Amino acid sequence: MAKVASSGAEEALATIDGAPRRNVKKSEAFVMSGDVLISLNRNVSSTYAKLLGDQLPPGTTVASSIHPHQLSRATASAGVSFPSMNRNGAAAQKLSRLPVPVSTSQIERRGSLARKTSEESSPTAIRMLKTAPIERMESTDVEESEEETVMMTTDEKENQKKPNENDDEVMVVDEEQFIVVSNDMKSPNEEIVAKSLRSAMFTMPTDNHHHSYNSSPQISTLSPHLRSNGDGPSRSPVYDDVDDDLNGSLDAKDMSNNSHQQSFRSPENYSEKDTPSKHSVVTIDGSGVSNHYDQDGMFSHVYYSTQDTTPKHGSPSLRKQIFESRTTPNTAASNSSASASPSLHATSESRGATGGVSLRSAESSNLNQTAVPSTSTNSVGGEREAAQIARNLYELKNCTSTQVADRLNEQNEFSFLILVKYLELFQFSTTRIDAALREFLSRVELRGESSARERLLRVFSARYLECNPAIFDSLDEVHTLTCALLLLNSDLHGPNMGKKMTARDFITNIAHTGCTFKREMLKTLFQSIKDNAISLQNSAKNSTANGSVASTSRRQPQQIYEVDPDSVVEYYSGFLMRKYVRETDGGKTPFGRRSWRMVYARLRGLVLYFDTDEHPKATSRYASLENAVSLHHALAEPAPDYKKKSFVFRVRIAHGGEILFQTSNQKELQEWCEKINFVAAAFSSPTLPLPVTSKPETAPMPRLPRIPCLAPITKQLSTHEARVAELNEMIEIVSQSVSPNQPQQLITDRWVLLSFEKRRYSTYINVLRRSLEARKASSATTMNIMMTPTRRQQQNQKPVVSEDRLSYTDAVNGAAAH
């Protein structure tokens, strides 16, 4: 209705050829609707000005007897000094007529007739903007946006020939907010529009107003699509578009029209809409947030405050904060190449000591222009919000892998928390490093500068070491091998036409880094990369041709757990003599299968594979599982009661299965027992809760899940300790229920089974503790070696490649040189 009334009134008045004569009796008429108050007469009397006071902020008074010079700044800027308020003389009449800018967006569309008569017959319009976005118009931007300023007084014709004495933008400090007035508009009436927005349309508590008593308030950039509520500062602006399922803040129509080159949060369609605020000077709502369009057409929010709200950027070394217990000083050496290149997230603003005005660079990505959210990162709500955003990023919901990489590279406290939650979603336990790298790069695309890429690779390395602490000794080893795999991938599958790298060259190059890896593992990794290249560009798969994000927001079906022998970590291997004693269900093995046979065993993840020799035959994935045994909740221990053979150890698997193995010496026996127990302790899922019964001494045993556990080692250790305490209570209850005069076989068998469970979990605890202690000792030894002056002198004398040779920067340069 407001638009129809405004359009009809303006079209009717646009047909008037000449200005009305001064001797005509003055009358006033208004067309009032929801958010538009249109005056059909240029001269408004004091009576209607008083009626208009209902639309003005509280405290504004209109008195016709007061001379315009005697009005206060707030009253004069409110636009209440109408021509009919003082009729004492022509000079006073001229002074009392205040020019009012009128939005000409509709008149411009009517053609030359409206352009010709817009200065004489366009009505005075005061648009009360309630929800329109707030813009910041510079004096130099008026010509670019093709806007006109129409003054509604006849005295303006006389002043058109006078040049403007001051075309610069001036700052007017008000008691409540900070208003920017452009002399090109020549309208103090816009100030009252802004004040009415703050006081009448927005109900903000007084505690949340940021008073600006200085002439240079600080401006910090917030993320797009931010809307403030009446409860204080806006909620977290970080990646609101990803969280569209919870908040509904993302318009799907605007999303589908964005170009592929721009970010999915770019308001391209929104900028095309004709809103009254496009012709205003500056309006600031109660929250103090203002929108403005930059040169690239992207819009951002500006937060006006005199307080220093500089975001506290995280440390450049992310691993020191996330995995502090897993790091060693060697990381500083491997970061030397990254520090040489310009940082992707260097601070682009320079703030003064007293909080001067500063703006971020217009070329920076909108994904990186996020401030620290109002939600505390240490609160439960902040962690919950970060976990939800991380889940959306992990599922590529309304975003691409390119945008995920930009989001993870942001440098603020809340983004750091999102990064931690995002990494926790990757479960690399029992997964070989090349398969884990493929999974990580399928969701995160390596882009940007070398420092940003290397930071993502180091974050991946830290997470892989967290999930597999028994494979590598330090973070540097994981990071070195990761960069080496990327170098190998670019050499084997890159556009270079030279000689391809061989397995011997690959092993030799890694040996120069100072890190020691098993030769068989390097051969396996080389063959895997050679047969299947690592894809480094996945953003095109996650978006449609017109740039809109593909429909990945639907709930993905739950994946069925599969074991791929070719992508699982191999912990140990060797020839063994095998004999089945009991089947997986606890029954005795048939006589024909109980003989001793030689096999080549491979311990990969939670599965023990058996082959005829060390070169497995090319079979399918499921065919290899036929000659395999699952080791979840298994226990390996020497079998001194077996007298027929020496160096024999027993493996008891879940639900009663038992297998005997014979080694060639005592050392191999201890190695096999240690590796099998570690795998079972680290990756066996916790048992399901016990059933509720009135007789706990006869209750069935809990079920043992087959799915591997993806919790860290420390969490598994605490779980096993709690299980031992629970078993002690159960053993005590069963012992009290046994009668010495009339023993019950069921209760006795249960007591034996509980005692075995206690011994199994106690063995798990000891194995995990030894593993953690060995890792700490290795880290301490590495630190001592690095801090020894003799060691430093020896390293300087050796003409070998430094340990950070295979960082990502050198890897890329090395790939280009081939």
From Swiss-Prot:
Residues 326-347 have a biased composition (Low complexity). Its main location: cytoplasm. It is found in: Cytoplasm, Cell cortex; Cell membrane. It comes from the Eukaryota. GO terms for molecular function: guanyl-nucleotide exchange factor activity; phospholipid binding. PROSITE patterns: PH_DOMAIN (PS50003), SEC7 (PS50190). Residues 213-223, 255-269, 361-380, 782-799 have a biased composition (Polar residues). Disruption phenotype: Abnormally long and dense microtubules at the cellular cortex of early embryonic cells and growing microtubule plus ends reside at the cortex for up to five times longer. Causes excess centrosome separation and displacement towards the cellular cortex early in mitosis and subsequently a loss of anaphase spindle-pole oscillations and increased rates of spindle elongation. The centrosome separation phenotype is dependent on the motor protein dynein. Weakly delayed nuclear envelope breakdown. Pfam families: PH_9 (PF15410), Sec7 (PF01369). Keywords: Cell membrane, Cytoplasm, Guanine-nucleotide releasing factor, Membrane. Residues 107-119, 154-165 have a biased composition (Basic and acidic residues). Residues 92-123, 137-168, 208-291, 326-383, 782-818 are annotated as: Disordered. The keyword Cell membrane applies. InterPro entries: PH-like_dom_sf, PH_9, PH_dom-spectrin-type, PH_domain, Sec7_C_sf, Sec7_dom, Sec7_dom_sf. Guanine nucleotide exchange factor for arf-6. Involved in response to injury in mechanosensory neurons. Inhibits axon regrowth via microtubule dynamics, possibly by inducing axonal microtubule catastrophes. Limits microtubule growth near the cellular cortex of early embryonic cells. A short conserved N-terminal region is necessary for the function of this protein. Transient relocalization to microtubule minus ends after neuronal injury also requires this region. Interacts (via short N-terminal region) with microtubule-associated proteins tac-1 and zyg-8. This is Exchange factor for Arf-6.
